[in-house]
Amino acid sequence: MATKKIFISAGETSGDIHGSNLIREIHKKNPSIKIYGLGRNRMVDAGLNCIHDMSSRSVMWMHTLEKIPGLWNVFKDCTRFFDEEKPALVILIDYVGFNLYLAKAAKRRNIPVMYYISPQLWAHGPWRVKKIRKLVDRMVVIYPFEEAFYASEGVSVKYVGHPLFDELNTRNIDEILVKKMRGGEGKTIVSLLPGSRKQEISRLLP
């Protein structure tokens, strides 16, 4: 029996973190599955056979794929992989501008597409839902309201919870530091999480 291959695409730091955890869980279920795709160091450490390192390719999407330096070649290498290796499944993690191109390429080749961690279409770009419905076989979402949002649009969807909580469960919480930050009155701590792109951090943080 041929070894099953899965292709995963994650273009950003956050996607690399969640993608690495996903790869580990897949290998817990079936260590023989070979995983290829696009990612960064964490996914490689988890077992990704990396076609392209995406460390320097996180961009704000304002152009077509052909006009973004380097990404067109990345896309062509991915489609070549689809043709030659015929993966059993393509898993896309956020990074909507690029990943929808991959979804379309996979769909043309009759390769099932799963989208893990939805792009925030409910906040911006709701017109992309039509593309999702056409190109993606299964949305796997991390917020409860996203499940209702996609279901109302006729998209096959499953809510699985936020992977950040799984990540936190692997960390030791410094209770002394938490108590110090809250102060004597036990104040609530609020975290500012502007995103993983340098552009987002520079634009959104004070």
What are these regions (language model features)?
Residues K4-R182, V190-I201, L205:
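Active-site and donor-binding regions of nucleotide-sugar-utilizing enzymes
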